């Protein structure tokens, strides 16, 4: 039996209608849907009734599956010849660990495609009417983690404040007082 294929799909930043048409189409034709808790659950309804649905959690402080286990699920299901959609909140490559997932797929010789999602780093300010770049005001945007894997602030946070661009912090609520103090 030949390997299936994995589609790593960004679900966008909240509402189900912010997913791309391509992402929705892949969900409609999948055999297995591996999804995070951060997605809009309405997206699950796009999958065929026969599709296997696997929730792998991924909420701040409540990771129901370790990343290594998620990688194994993707590889195992694809080796069964199935079409797998890995549905991730936001964009898979903006603090979404999509890079780790494609490394596992490459190591296992599993074919994959990536469907970008709308990242909250751009969409949230935009929906609030705040441009992340603006002619003559902000010529760049910097997306920074609000905490590292060791649950600390990034070491270069003070240098970030010296840029002439817009700073966007993701996953920083718990460290917000420290972030503000260091800027």
Regions found by a protein language model. Name each.
Residues 2-6, 112-113, 119-183:
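Beta-strand/loop-alpha-helix module characteristic of Rossmann-like adenine-cofactor folds
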Residues 1-16, 21-118, 123:
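Class I S-adenosyl-L-methionine
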């Amino acid at each position: 039996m030949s390997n299936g294929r994995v589609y790593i799909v960004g679900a966008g930043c909240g509402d189900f209608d912010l997913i791309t048409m391509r992402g929705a189409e892949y969900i409609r034709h999948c055999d297995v849907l591996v999804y995070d808790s951060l997605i809009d659950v309405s997206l699950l309804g796009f999958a065929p009734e026969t599709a296997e649905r696997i929730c792998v959690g991924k909420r701040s402080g409540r990771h129901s599956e370790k990343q290594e286990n998620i990688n194994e699920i993707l590889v195992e299901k694809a080796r069964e010849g199935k079409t797998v959609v890995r549905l991730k909140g936001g964009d898979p490559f903006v603090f979404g660990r999509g890079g780790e997932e494609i490394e596992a797929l490459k190591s296992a010789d599993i074919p994959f495609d990536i469907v970008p999602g709308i990242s909250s780093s751009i969409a949230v300010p935009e929906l609030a009417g705040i441009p992340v770049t603006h002619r003559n005001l902000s010529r760049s945007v910097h997306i920074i983690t609000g905490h590292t894997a060791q649950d600390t602030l990034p070491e270069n946070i003070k240098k970030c404040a010296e840029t002439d661009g817009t700073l966007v912090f993701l996953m920083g609520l718990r460290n917000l007082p420290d972030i503000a103090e260091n800027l």
